[in-house]
From Swiss-Prot:
EC primary class: oxidoreductase
GO biological process, one term: nitrogen utilization
UniProt binding sites for FMN: 68-69, 134, 143, 159-160, 209
Reactions catalysed: uracil + FMNH2 + NADH + O2 = (Z)-3-ureidoacrylate + FMN + NAD(+) + H2O + H(+); thymine + FMNH2 + NADH + O2 = (Z)-2-methylureidoacrylate + FMN + NAD(+) + H2O + H(+)
Record's keyword terms, sorted: Flavoprotein, FMN, Monooxygenase, NADP, Oxidoreductase
Gene name as annotated: rutA
Family note: Belongs to the NtaA/SnaA/DszA monooxygenase family. RutA subfamily.
Lineage: superkingdom: Bacteria
Keyword DNA repair attached: no
NCBIfam families associated with the record: RutA
Protein name: Pyrimidine monooxygenase RutA
Inducing factors: Up-regulated by the nitrogen regulatory protein C (NtrC also called GlnG) and repressed by RutR.
The organism's taxonomic lineage, starting at the top: Bacteria, Pseudomonadati, Pseudomonadota, Gammaproteobacteria, Enterobacterales
A Pfam family annotated for this UniProt entry: Bac_luciferase
Length: 382
């Protein structure tokens, strides 16, 4: 029997605030976000991601984001050993969509800021002003050592100093088309970028450490954070509160967008059975590699994203918050997410992206009070 899912009751003022944004974290790497031999096994392709993002756009998702990963975890599943590149993928997706916001991720150790500024301006032109950039400092040392560009372990403690200079160059070039910035990491000499973006370029980040949140508070339009636990949709609230407090120090409005995996079915029991099946097939070899890498950063503190990713509690999906249940239960839990102060959106992954987005759009989203402003849609006819 399907479990009942009581609906939250909001005032009109609450409802105006709780029109939560929904995004999809596209599977740019093989197998998405489940490190399990029991999960769907697939390679990343443009055609797959095109189908995912077009389906997300049909169901009124607000944005799509791709990460960047330059070396995987190995193991039986060869987890994330096969990856597309973020900017070129999102440029292609920008050309085959019309409404959804598109974000690519810049691994800032690999790309000079002037090149990122020009690539972003190009995708702004392709998308008609729907593009933004996610900036990451880089934590997985082997990704950069393999190319001979790891700057040394000192970088762990200086990475946000580096990123601060990086974003200042971007701001110069996007804002005025010119930069003469001089810093410890970058020296611009009458550097030029034209054309400039047609609209102000959104910059996002995923800082969870104090330094990361301070950076986001100063420079980001919003900040990603991990959800926490299984069916504990508001457990991230202290993280959102920290981000809100950091933003208050800069006088800016920087909301939190929370990462969750959705595993849904007709009933709570059926969804739970899928989740347990995935956990039973955990790729222990790949997970061991993740744990080993997470221990190499001894300088950034204990509150970083990678520390949470490697926690053995739910490492099978990198410890992102997981919502497991019937369609009604997942809708209720997402409404709870929207009730947390500072939470302005969620970034969703699915065990099966194509069917997951479809069932989300048709069976979950129509039950969500924080998405009640949207029409109810059925599957798009090809």
């Amino acid at each position: 029997m399907q479990n009942a899912a009581p609906r939250l009751t909001f005032t009109l003022r609450d409802e105006e605030r709780l029109m939560m944004k929904i995004g999809v974290f596209v599977p740019i790497g093989n197998n998405g976000w489940l490190i399990s031999t029991h999960a769907p096994q697939y390679m990343p392709t443009f055609e797959l991601n095109k189908a995912i993002v077009q389906k997300a756009e049909h169901y009124h998702f607000d944005f799509a984001l791709s990460m960047i990963k330059l070396r995987g975890f190995g193991g039986k599943t060869e987890f994330w050993d096969h990856n597309l590149e973020s900017f070129t993928l999102m440029a292609g997706l920008a050309a085959v969509t019309s409404r959804i916001q598109i974000y690519a991720t810049a691994a800032t150790l690999t790309l000079p800021p002037a090149i990122v500024a020009r690539m972003a301006a190009t995708i702004d032109s392709i998308s008609g002003g729907r593009f933004g950039v996610n900036l990451v400092t880089g934590w997985q040392k082997p990704e950069y050592e393999q190319m001979g560009i790891w700057p040394g372990d000192d970088y762990f403690s200086r990475r946000y100093d580096y990123l601060t200079e990086y974003v200042q160059v971007l701001r110069d070039l996007w804002g005025t088309g010119k930069s003469d910035f001089k810093g410890d990491f970058f020296t611009m000499n009458d550097c030029r970028v034209s054309p400039q973006p047609s609209v102000p370029m959104k910059v996002i980040c995923a800082g969870q450490s104090d330094a990361g949140m301070a950076f986001s508070a100063q420079y980001a339009d919003f900040n990603f954070c991990f959800g926490k636990g299984v069916n504990t949709p508001t457990a991230f609230a202290p993280t959102a509160a920290r981000m809100k407090q950091a933003a208050e120090q800069t006088g800016r409005d920087v909301g939190s967008y929370v990462l969750f995996m959705v595993i849904a079915d007709e009933t709570d029991d059926a969804a739970r059975a899928k989740w347990e099946h995935y956990k039973a097939g955990a790729d222990e070899e790949a997970l061991s590699w993740l744990t080993e890498q997470s221990q190499k950063d001894t300088r950034s503190g204990t509150d970083t994203n990678v520390r949470q990713m490697a926690d053995p509690t739910s490492a099978v999906n990198i410890n992102m918050g997981t919502l497991v249940g019937s369609y009604a239960s997942v809708a209720r839990m997402l409404d709870e997410v929207a009730s947390v102060p500072g939470a302005e959106g969620v970034l969703l992954t699915f065990d099966d992206f194509l069917s997951g987005i479809e069932t989300f759009g048709e069976r979950i989203q129509p039950l969500m009070q924080c998405r009640a402003h949207l029409p109810v849609l059925t599957q798009e006819v090809a």
